[in-house]
């Protein structure tokens, strides 16, 4: 199965088509700078541009640089304060007319490591640290995510 994987970051928005079984990129990665200010409307315009770039009409898996609970942005992170309490998955779905699956960027990076990478079949605790515009973390115990750890916010 293929999905458009997208990473919304504090300085750039990146996307590529991904094989969900292997985690391999099927397309070249495309990057557009995160708009300043990174308001919901401005970011949604870049997300739409990404979807159009790939001529994509199916679901999008999207990582987001802050705490996300059930698709809702809890903190604004490195983005505009306007993001706080936005139901991000529905916002992008309405703006782009495709389903969106949204989660914290570091949690998703960790999920990739647990599923396909260095953490595969590891028992006990596995901690994944991401460093970009901000610092993120994904913590797993026996392969199960402990969501929204956000040690970069301590």
Residue ranges of model-derived segments:
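Glycine/GP-enriched mid-protein hinge/lid loop-to-helix segment characteristic of carbohydrate kinases
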Residues: 2, 16-20, 27, 38-41, ...
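Generic N-terminal amphipathic, Lys/Arg-enriched alpha-helix
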Residues: 6, 21-33
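Conserved Rossmann-like nucleotide-cofactor binding loop
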Residues: 11
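Residue-level signal for inorganic ion chemistry
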Residues: 15, 32, 62
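Residue-level structural signal for beta-strand termini and adjacent loop
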Residues: 18, 30-32, 74, 79, ...
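Glycine-rich phosphate-binding loop and adjoining helix at the ATP-binding site
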Residues: 28, 37-48, 52, 58-60, ...
């Amino acid at each position: 199965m293929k999905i458009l994987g997208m990473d919304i970051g504090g300085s750039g928005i990146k996307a590529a088509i991904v094989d969900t079984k292997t985690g391999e990129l099927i397309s070249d990665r495309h990057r557009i700078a995160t708009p300043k200010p990174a308001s919901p409307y401005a970011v949604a315009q870049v997300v739409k541009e990404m979807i159009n770039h790939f001529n994509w009409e199916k679901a999008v898996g999207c990582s987001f640089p802050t705490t996300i609970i059930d698709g809702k942005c809890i903190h604004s992170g490195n983005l505009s304060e306007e993001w706080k309490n936005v139901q991000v998955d529905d916002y992008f779905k309405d703006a782009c007319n495709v389903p969106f699956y949204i989660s914290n960027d570091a949690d998703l990076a960790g999920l990739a490591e647990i599923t396909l990478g260095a953490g595969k079949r590891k028992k006990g605790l596995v901690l994944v640290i991401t460093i970009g515009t901000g610092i993120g973390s994904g913590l797993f115990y026996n392969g199960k995510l402990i969501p929204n750890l956000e040690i970069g916010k301590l």
